[in-house]
């Protein structure tokens, strides 16, 4: 049977990135748990070996159970009866296997029953699971909501909720409402404090809630009477054991059928405040969403990998005109670009995850003791890098998942349009990735300030100073010219001093920055392991160079007066 970890050597390469040593030192607090927990690592090598073993177990479960159940789960789906969700039979089997393997609460401290894993190896597990079944990946990976409760909840909440998640209970984040989608400041679910009950009571409706009948919910609700903006919103914890929330219906979706997307009705549902009042949206949901966006980036890479695998296997097997179709330039061109996008997107994903790991670990240490000046500087640096890279990782990988799924079907030809092949499920599942947890357009809104304030170009110029192998030098020379075009395009838009023009060109500028950054990451990877990455470095740079040229040409030739032609 396939192992979704060991079959992909690129994952082990990213696990062994040199930055992991610093991440492990911070996460393990210099390996202080070794005297208290027999499964805690003794040193860096022991920690990475532990991550590797858990990833191998995840890959085995994914290959033997989750992938095997994927088609059946897609067809059966979950059901709603008497206000409750019943998972598909295959989903129950998947969850049971993951719980028995101890793959829940992975990033939580060991004192709560977690594995104390950094974000990076956990994200690899999320990618692996999504490659087999993106719908199940949603249910399982929502465990990362516990990060927000851990970060902002109190000690009592930690002791009551975190061990339950580590033991396999599920989570959801209840944000969206019928009239509050991307515009979350419009949330109107009402939270009223009851002196009689000594808790908050929630009333209203939530919509499009992934895994909406979860055991533990993080809920965004309006706690401040008379407010209508984000400052009136707080974050609450709802425990299903308390009752008061019913599933009105499960949405009939295009894809991710295994994941129940629910409409929820709150009727005096007892809940407790998480953190401080009024900070629900402006602080806690922003942290929650950044974690979710990294998760969707991982899901997208998993889907890209699945699409590439299916396309490659079919192209090798299918014969036309006396030879396998993979031998035709039109087909091997598509496959090479699919692999280039996959490798580039994965490099961006794990670079982002490593940035998140360092600043999150330092944040956690700061709750125990005062950081040194050097640590504060390190925390600030990596928090900024994580904030700037997250919208790129989510935005680009979700678009690439869709593009790779599209090309996978194209490689299959007429067979790809039939329901018998997995490519149709991958295509349907991929479509949501560029929509939920913030559309690509909203990722552009998040990213554009890092274009205009010079963060991306500064990172790119820093990457230019990193030595590369002699074989990669010609690519680096071309890449520097691409960066010059990006910088010139950015300056041209900024000098126009027109906000509407900036908003209009933002997507192009974001993609230019992302393409150049991903090329740098691939060149760095190919310099260390040419066997794995040299081909993709060449293919992706050719692709990205044309994309940057296209966007630069558009911006150079565009007159802001032409905006009128685009408006209805």
Predicted feature residues:
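A short core secondary-structure module
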Residues: 199, 203-245
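C-terminal helix-coil-helix/basic helical segment that borders enzyme active sites and/or dimer interfaces
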Residues: 343-394, 490-504, 523-531
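A glycine-rich, basic-preceded beta-loop-alpha segment at the flavin cofactor/substrate interface
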Residues: 241-244, 248, 260-292, 309-326, ...
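A structural-propensity feature for long, helix-poor, extended segments
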Residues: 154-160, 439, 445-487
């Amino acid at each position: 049977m396939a192992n979704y970890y060991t079959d992909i050597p690129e994952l082990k390469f990213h696990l062994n990135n040199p930055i992991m040593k610093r991440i492990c030192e911070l996460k393990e607090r210099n390996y202080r748990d070794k005297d208290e927990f027999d499964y805690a690592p003794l040193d860096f090598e022991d920690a990475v070996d532990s991550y590797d073993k858990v990833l191998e177990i995840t890959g085995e479960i994914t290959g033997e159970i989750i992938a095997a159940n994927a088609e059946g789960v897609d067809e059966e789906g979950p059901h709603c009866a008497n206000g409750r969700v019943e998972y598909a039979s295959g989903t129950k089997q998947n969850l049971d296997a993951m719980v028995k393997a101890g793959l829940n609460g992975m990033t939580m401290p060991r004192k709560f029953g977690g594995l104390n894993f950094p974000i990076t190896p956990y994200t690899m597990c999320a990618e692996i699971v999504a490659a087999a079944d993106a719908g199940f990946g949603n249910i399982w990976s929502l465990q990362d909501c516990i990060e927000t409760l851990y970060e902002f909840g109190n000690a009592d909440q930690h002791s009551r909720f975190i061990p339950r998640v580590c033991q396999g209970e599920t989570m959801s984040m209840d944000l969206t409402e019928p009239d509050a989608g991307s515009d979350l400041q419009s949330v109107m679910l009402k939270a009223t404090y009851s002196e009689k009950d000594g808790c908050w009571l929630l009333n209203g409706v939530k919509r499009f809630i992934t895994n909406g009948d979860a055991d533990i919910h993080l809920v965004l609700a309006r706690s401040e009477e008379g407010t209508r903006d984000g400052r009136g919103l707080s974050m609450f914890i709802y425990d299903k054991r308390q009752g008061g929330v019913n599933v009105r219906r499960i949405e009939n979706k295009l894809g991710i059928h295994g994941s129940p997307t629910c409409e929820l009705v709150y009727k005096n549902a007892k809940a407790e405040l998480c953190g401080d009042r009024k900070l629900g949206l402006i602080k806690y949901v922003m942290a929650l969403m950044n974690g979710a966006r990294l998760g969707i980036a991982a899901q997208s890479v998993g889907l890209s990998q699945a699409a590439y695998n299916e396309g490659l296997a079919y192209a090798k097997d299918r014969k036309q005109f006396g030879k396998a179709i993979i031998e035709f330039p039109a087909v091997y061109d598509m496959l090479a670009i699919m692999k280039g996008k996959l490798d580039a997107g994965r490099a961006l994903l794990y670079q982002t995850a490593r940035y998140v790991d360092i600043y999150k670990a330092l944040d956690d240490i700061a709750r125990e003791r005062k950081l040194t000046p050097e640590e504060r500087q390190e925390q600030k640096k990596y928090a900024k890098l994580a904030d700037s890279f997250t919208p790129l990782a989510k935005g680009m990988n979700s678009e690439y998942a869709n593009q790779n799924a599209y090309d996978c079907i194209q490689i299959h030809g007429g067979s790809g349009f039939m329901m018998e092949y997995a490519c149709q499920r991958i295509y349907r599942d991929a479509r949501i990735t560029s929509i939920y947890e913030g559309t690509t357009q909203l990722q552009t809104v998040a990213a554009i300030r890092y274009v205009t304030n010079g963060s991306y170009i500064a990172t790119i110029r820093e990457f230019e100073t990193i030595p590369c192998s002699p074989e990669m030098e010609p690519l680096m020379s071309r890449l520097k010219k691409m960066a010059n075009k990006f910088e010139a395009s950015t300056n041209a838009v900024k000098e126009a001093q027109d906000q509407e023009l900036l908003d209009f060109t933002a997507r192009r500028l974001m993609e230019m920055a992302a393409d150049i950054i991903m090329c740098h990451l691939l060149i760095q990877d190919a310099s260390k392991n040419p066997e794995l990455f040299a081909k993709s470095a060449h293919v992706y740079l050719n692709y990205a160079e044309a994309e940057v040229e296209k966007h630069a040409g558009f911006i150079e030739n565009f007159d802001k007066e032409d905006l009128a032609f685009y408006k209805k």
